[in-house]
From Swiss-Prot:
Belongs to the IIV-6 118L/458R family. This is Putative myristoylated protein 118L. A lipid is attached at G2 (N-myristoyl glycine). It comes from the Viruses. The chain crosses the membrane at residues 188-208, 214-234, 482-502. It is a multi-pass membrane protein. Keywords: Lipoprotein, Membrane, Myristate, Transmembrane, Transmembrane helix. It is found in: Membrane. GO terms for cellular component: membrane.
């Protein structure tokens, strides 16, 4: 399952970027002096390019597209798309087995966004491929609508795969999700293989079957016991779905009355899942706002289960909060309500490791309960109730020179009206990848802002709120598939062994030799 999770992450990030890229292309209105994505020349009169599948004959400037994707509106839209799609990766997990559902999902979304950032800000910017739509000899506006850029997926996917392979967090998240996956038949288990090898080893080697009259019947008995255990021994698990728009009693596909279940006040969806799993009469549960309803000794229709497994239940969570960047000629203090701080005196970079500052919940911004604190700065490590390091912590320094200024903002330094050699500008448009610019003298005279290093900033604060969203779950009873394989293996060994020990094969060979 680990490989499938990684491939799903690659696919969802690729799909989100391609989808948004195509939206950028579809809504592009290029004129003579606006050619972010398209190259349009000598226009006079309106030109509409519509209804085409653009492949070999038309290309897009990948650098221009990267810049378009990273403007504020497109970037927010892309992050929300990725967050929404990432929820599908954990759909159907057993919440009772997931150590920390909130942190796992938040980390998954954050990692996907980090992969997206590397793709759109580094890989695509360095891609030499240019996909241009060239329109000549026209005047007026040019509208490009209802076109499909099929080459985008191939170019973008290679960038996403490279970014994903270099992301260390993805491996940890994959392992966590894999452990929470509902059990399925995995094929031959090591225990089953070992038992078969032992059974075969007892028969002897080199055609000597000492004690076969005792051993092989025992092997056959073992086969029978394995068959019986296979049909009688089941494993009970709960397949859970979070972020649901409608609970079981709210869904028209389920036709279940809430009054038909047993209500219970319980703190989280995970606890509700565990309680249902431990009750053999519980076939399904729903949970919302601290209250669970358990449905027992009843049949849940396939249309109800399909409603959730097919994804029609999804809501609009999670929330990705826009980070607040502030600055001042001093170090930050606790009363400074922000996520990041630049000391303009010494160039030090500070992060507030308490995301409760201005975190979105309940329809407003405020502070979340203390026990749900996370340390998102530089890695998104969950710290639970540990207060160490909560608050402002220095993350690093941008290396400010004496008697020179340093500043930051949401975009490149072209907005600065006055600058001097050695000044530094930090672009926090993408909070997780901060771009550092230095004002330098260029050969031949004049000065330019030179883009230098890209350093790790602070990742997005994601409030997936898994265990506080609506949740439902279904009881699943699965058989130990390896027992079936063991029974079949022992049966084969026992039958063949009995045949050898009875001399069946030797009698046939003797009969042939006499003829």
């Amino acid at each position: 399952m680990g490989a499938s999770i990684s491939s799903n992450v690659t696919k969802l990030v690729t799909d989100a970027i391609v989808r948004t890229s195509n939206e950028v292309v579809q809504t592009a209105h290029a004129t003579n002096n606006q050619s972010i994505v398209f190259d349009v020349k000598n226009t006079s009169g309106d030109v509409v390019i519509s209804g085409n599948t653009i492949r070999q004959t038309a290309t897009i400037n990948m650098v221009g597209l990267s810049q378009a994707l990273n403007n504020s509106d497109n970037n927010i839209k892309l992050d929300q798309q990725i967050a929404q799609m990432a929820k599908a990766v954990i759909s159907g997990l057993n919440l009772a087995q997931l150590a920390d559902a909130n942190n796992t999902v938040d980390s998954l979304i954050k990692t996907c966004i980090e992969i997206k950032n590397v793709t759109t800000q580094q890989c695509m910017m360095n891609t030499s491929q240019k996909i241009n739509v060239l329109v000549e000899g026209t005047k007026g506006n040019v509208s490009i609508v209802n076109n499909e850029i099929s080459q985008l997926a191939t170019s973008i996917q290679s960038c996403v795969e490279k970014a994903a392979s270099n992301n260390k967090n993805l491996q940890d998240i994959t392992s966590s999700i894999q452990q929470a996956a509902t059990s399925e038949a995995k094929g031959l288990s090591l225990a089953m293989i070992a038992l078969i090898i032992v059974a075969m080893g007892l028969t002897g080697v080199g055609g000597v079957y000492a004690g076969g009259k005792i051993i092989f019947p025992a092997v056959l008995i073992g086969s029978i016991v394995s068959f019986v255990l296979y049909f009688q021994w089941t494993v009970r698990e709960i397949s859970s779905y979070s972020f649901v728009q409608n609970t079981l009693s709210e869904s028209a596909d389920c036709s279940i009355q809430k009054s038909s279940g047993e209500s219970d006040n319980i703190g989280s969806a995970k606890s509700a899942s565990e309680k249902c799993q431990n009750d053999n009469t519980c076939v399904a549960y729903e949970w919302q706002n601290g209250q669970a309803v358990y449905y027992k000794n009843m049949t849940i229709g396939n249309s109800c289960k399909s409603y959730y497994s097919n994804g029609a239940h999804k809501d609009t969570l999670p929330v990705i909060k826009k980070l607040i960047f502030q600055k001042g000629a001093r170090n930050p203090v606790n009363t400074d309500v922000a996520n990041a701080w630049l000391n303009t005196l010494d160039g030090s970079f500070w992060v507030n490791s308490d995301p409760n500052v201005l975190k979105y919940f309940g329809g407003r911004y405020g502070r979340l309960p203390y026990q749900t604190r996370y340390l998102y700065a530089s890695g998104g490590t969950y710290v639970g109730d540990d207060v160490n390091g909560v608050g402002w912590n220095q993350q690093g320094s941008f290396g400010k020179r004496a008697n020179r200024t340093i500043d930051w903002g949401d975009g490149p330094p072209s907005t600065i009206t006055s600058q001097a050699e050695g000044d530094i500008w930090v672009d926090y448009h993408d909070p997780s990848l901060l771009k550092v610019y230095t004002y330098i003298a260029q050969q031949g005279g004049g000065f330019i802002w030179q883009s230098g290093q890209i350093i790790k900033g602070i990742g997005p604060i994601v409030n997936s709120n898994v265990e506080n969203s609506k949740s439902v779950g279904f009881a699943i009873e699965s058989k130990k598939q390896w027992l079936l394989y063991l029974a079949i293996g022992l049966l084969i060994v026992g039958v063949i062994g009995m045949a050898f020990s009875s001399g069946m094969f030797s009698k046939k060979n003797n009969g042939k030799s006499k003829q």
